């Protein structure tokens, strides 16, 4: 069986490729990326660009199961177009089973909300793919490491609401995705990759303080305060919009969910946030 990963040059894509190559079964693994020359090892590199649909149709030929990982393009509406085009290219290429990486709490929204592109991709996949699976994921624990480091510098961990989040390690998402791609019985399923525990803002701040032995409190701020802070930090408009959208979803409880899907799909328990934070925050640079 030939398995393809589209968007394979990013952190998640590379992690999934590594997971697939570790699994027994003699699968042929194809990494589809704009830089196929960087693909090494047993995996085959193929050129594919989400902004050039014709390249995708060629890259997907001969693949039995394909995972589409959306790009990080922040231009409003662009990712929606890319997702639809990638799915259409996979159908045209004759891919039998198409999997799509999405986000927890996805719902119908207007651009530039990040959820809009995931929603459109999910709906188009369900309507057109011969067989499909969706893997929604919670916020990365690794992304929270960056927020924690900034919070330590500022002396406060800020958020739009005191909502709980079950952060998930990137490696656990990769293992779950690999489990879908090599396993059977996943057609028509929607899974949620989450961490094992839901932590409130105050609990997250307390965890950071415990690990680093530095005082830290959690504080609720307004959307205006968040927007101003991001702008002053020098983030581009697309970056500000992305963070605002993610924080709004967090405040709405989109990531306040714990499932057993990571263990079900990967065969191993997901890492708690503490394990991810400990190594990063105990480094000499923090």
Language-model segments: residues:
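Short linear loop/turn motifs
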Residues: 243-249, 276-280
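Rossmann-fold cofactor-recognition segment
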Residues: 40-52
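Short loop/helix-cap segments at secondary-structure boundaries that form the rim of catalytic
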Residues: 35-43, 58
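Amphipathic terminal alpha-helices
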Residues: 261, 269-286
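Flexible coil/turn residues that form the inter-helical turn or adjacent wing/linker of helix-turn-helix
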Residues: 197, 255, 269
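Oxidoreductase cofactor-interface core, primarily capturing Rossmann-like NAD(P)-dependent enzymes
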Residues: 2-34, 51-54, 61, 65, ...
């Amino acid at each position: 069986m030939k398995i393809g990963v589209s968007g394979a040059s990013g952190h998640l894509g590379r992690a999934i490729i590594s997971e697939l190559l570790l699994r027994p079964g003699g699968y042929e693994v194809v990494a589809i990326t704009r830089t196929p020359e960087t693909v090494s090892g047993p995996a085959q590199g193929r050129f594919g660009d989400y902004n050039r649909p014709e390249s995708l149709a060629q890259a997907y030929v001969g693949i039995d199961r394909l995972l589409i990982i959306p790009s990080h393009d922040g231009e409003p509406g662009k990712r929606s177009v890319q997702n639809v085009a990638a799915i259409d290219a996979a159908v045209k290429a004759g891919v039998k089973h198409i999997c799509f990486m999405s986000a927890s709490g996805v719902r119908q929204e207007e651009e530039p909300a990040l959820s809009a592109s995931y929603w459109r991709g999910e709906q188009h996949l369900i309507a057109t793919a011969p067989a499909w699976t969706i893997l929604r994921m919670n916020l990365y624990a690794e992304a929270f490491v960056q927020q924690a480091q900034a919070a330590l510098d500022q002396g406060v961990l800020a958020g739009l609401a005191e909502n709980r989040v079950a952060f998930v390690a990137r490696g656990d998402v990769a293992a779950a995705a690999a489990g879908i791609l090599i396993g059977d019985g996943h057609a028509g399923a929607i899974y949620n990759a989450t961490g094992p525990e839901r932590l409130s803002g105050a609990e997250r701040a307390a965890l950071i303080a415990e690990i680093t032995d530095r005082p830290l409190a959690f504080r609720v701020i307004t959307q205006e305060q968040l927007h101003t802070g991001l702008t002053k930090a020098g983030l581009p408009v697309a970056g500000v919009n992305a963070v605002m959208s993610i924080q709004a979803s967090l405040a709405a409880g989109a990531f306040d969910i714990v499932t057993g899907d990571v263990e079900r799909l990967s065969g191993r328990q997901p890492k708690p946030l503490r394990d991810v934070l400990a190594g990063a925050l105990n480094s000499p640079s923090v």
